[in-house]
Regions:
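Radical SAM enzyme core and accessory elements
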Residues: 1-8, 42-47, 65, 163-165, ...
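A structural motif corresponding to the C-terminal end of an alpha-helix
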Residues: 38-47, 215-216, 270, 305-316, ...
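Flexible glycine/acidic-rich beta-alpha junction loops that bind and position SAM and/or redox cofactors
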Residues: 14-18, 109, 185, 231-232, ...
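Short beta-alpha junction loops
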Residues: 100-105, 256, 322, 354
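Acidic, low-complexity intrinsically disordered segments
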Residues: 2-216
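Structural recognition of alpha->loop->beta junctions
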Residues: 109-128, 270-275, 336-350
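Radical SAM [4Fe-4S] cluster-binding motif and immediate context
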Residues: 153-326, 334-338
């Protein structure tokens, strides 16, 4: 096979943005797999060109020219942008390939607009695609490896792609690393709940960290593990061996069950500066919390633990999912407000319940019940739309509570209380920037606007109530405006999708259950 010129587009952003927090952080959210893909393409004898779109570039100008194949990596929020990019390249005779979360969640829809749609991806699968590289105008080929790859290219092999992306980060630069794939927990709303936990090689982790120290004096590593520290001793030993002088700082997403005080002492000693635990709900949720308590008892226990974590780790973000079927009335929202008061140093990150196609076993139940709405992918970023009709609320009642909770959490009073409860300067600064930018005040403004439209926009309200499936003008206008130039390249029908495709597929003929969770190894 001749040497191919390959474009790889990592869509961190769904559209152009000018948000302060996005400017600071988006480059740090670059995916690892686009970089891995580039290394595999090199090893197969090809010439890859990687672009990470953060929302601040002129994407039309940066897209690679004169390529044979284009790979696009996208979350569902970038689905419409990905479809437009694919259409642009297909018009030029270029074969297009979609990977990433959107490909796994919506393969049937993505295959309408891409030649190849890849689920789990390994080097052999990439080689097969490049060998064939055939256009499929009548419907793309959906392919997947049997499971995640057992190993990934080293940080040294990825470095030139990491370095180019981090040049876009103006202040804080996170080097992306990963030590495990999948998750042992059983949260039925999570894309990893049915993916077997698979640690990658700890000797390779140590080697990567040693290499990183040859490039930066005091680097920050952003770990992409779905749940960092399941094999806690192995992680800590690898870090200690690679960085005995504790020059590296780490940011991790972990579960409360792993954040005991002895573990926190070791995390602090090894440079962990930020943790992002999932609270999810004040009711039982997949064994990710070490408590079996619910309601106010859980609020008090979790707040106590979060305050203890803040004595060791300077930055804590707590993750919540709003609109779950266990939520009813004012209580879950009032409990969260109480938590904000009891643990003022934690930054609360709220996600609206979303059913991302095939992402999670729970989505089948929502589809069987007729509760999933065909909201355009562009809005499925956990905040700009909720595509599952709430079980125990009508839309005005839900948004009244959402606006109230968000306003409470990012009020001037809450921001000021967060400052003294956060121990060091950079975390204080980050919390303020996030609160007054798109993640705090921006969401208050958006949720308030949408709540108002529920009373005045009959087309939108009817769509959200499931009375019709016609995409409301509200969504069409925003997609057109936000995509700008790329709106012209949206293929016909790109805003619509079959929200019940998972249910209709052959896989759904057999009941799918989240596999039984396994106890995490003792620390």
């Amino acid at each position: 096979m001749r040497k191919l010129r390959i474009g790889i587009v990592d869509l961190v952003a769904r559209a152009p943005t000018r948000a302060i927090y996005s400017k600071v952080m988006n480059a740090n959210l670059a995916g690892i797999m686009p970089q891995v893909l580039a290394v595999w393409c090199e090893e197969l004898g090809h010439d890859p060109h990687v672009i990470c779109y953060t929302g601040f570039e002129d994407l039309a100008a940066e897209l690679p020219k004169d390529v044979d194949v284009v790979f696009v990596s996208a979350f569902s929020q970038s689905g419409q942008l990905a479809y437009a990019i694919s259409n642009l390249f297909r018009q030029r005779g270029v074969v297009t390939v979609l990977g990433g979360p959107h490909a796994r969640c919506y393969p049937e829809d993505a295959a309408r607009f891409f030649d190849y749609v890849l689920g789990f991806t390994d080097k052999a699968l990439v080689a097969e695609v490049l060998e064939e590289r055939a256009p499929y105008p009548a419907g793309g080929r959906v392919m997947a490896a049997p499971k995640h790859p057992m190993e990934l290219p080293s940080l040294e092999a990825r470095w030139k792609y990491v370095e180019r992306t981090l040049e876009k980060a103006p202040l804080i630069k996170f080097v992306p690393m990963i030590g495990s794939l999948g998750c042992p927990y059983t949260c039925s709303f999570c894309i990893d709940s049915t993916v077997e936990y698979q640690p990658l090689g700890f000797p390779q982790i140590a080697a990567d960290l040693k290499f990183l120290l040859t490039k930066h004096k005091a680097p920050i590593v952003g770990w992409h593990d779905p749940n960092f520290g399941i094999r806690f001793d192995d992680y800590m030993t690898a870090i200690e061996q690679a960085d005995p002088n504790h020059r590296i700082r780490h940011i991790v997403e972990s579960s409360l069950s792993l954040l005991s005080e002895p573990n926190l002492k070791r995390l602090r000693a090894n440079g962990v500066q930020a943790v992002l635990p999932g609270v999810e709900s004040w009711y039982d949720m997949g064994n990710k919390s070490k408590t079996r308590r619910t309601g106010m008892d859980k609020v008090e226990q979790v707040a106590e633990q979060i305050n203890m974590i803040l004595r060791y780790i300077p930055y804590v973000q707590t993750n919540f999912v709003l609109g779950l079927d266990t939520d009813e009335g004012d209580e879950p929202f009032e409990l969260t407000k109480k938590f904000v008061d009891l643990a003022p140093g934690a930054f609360p990150a709220y996600s609206l319940l979303s059913a991302f196609g095939r992402a999670a076993p729970m989505n089948l139940d929502y589809q069987r019940a007729g509760r999933v709405l065909p909201v355009p992918h562009h809005f499925l970023n956990n905040n700009h739309a909720m595509n599952v009709k709430p079980k125990n609320y009508d839309w005005p009642a839900f948004y009244d509570r959402l606006v109230d909770l968000t306003s409470y959490s990012f009020s001037g009073r809450a921001i000021m209380r967060r400052l003294p409860a956060t121990p060091t300067f950079i975390p204080k600064w980050m919390n303020v920037i996030r609160a007054v930018s798109s993640e705090g005040w921006g969401r208050i403004k958006y949720h308030t606007m949408l709540r108002g439209r529920l009373d005045t926009d009959r087309e939108l309200r009817g769509f959200l109530d499931g009375e019709h499936s016609k995409i409301p003008e509200f969504y069409r206008e925003r997609v057109t405006r936000e995509l700008g130039y790329f709106a012209e390249w949206l293929p016909k029908g790109a805003l619509e999708h079959d929200q019940n495709a998972y249910l209709k597929s052959e896989a759904a003929l057999v009941p799918i259950r989240a596999r039984a969770g396994r106890a995490a190894p003792a620390a």
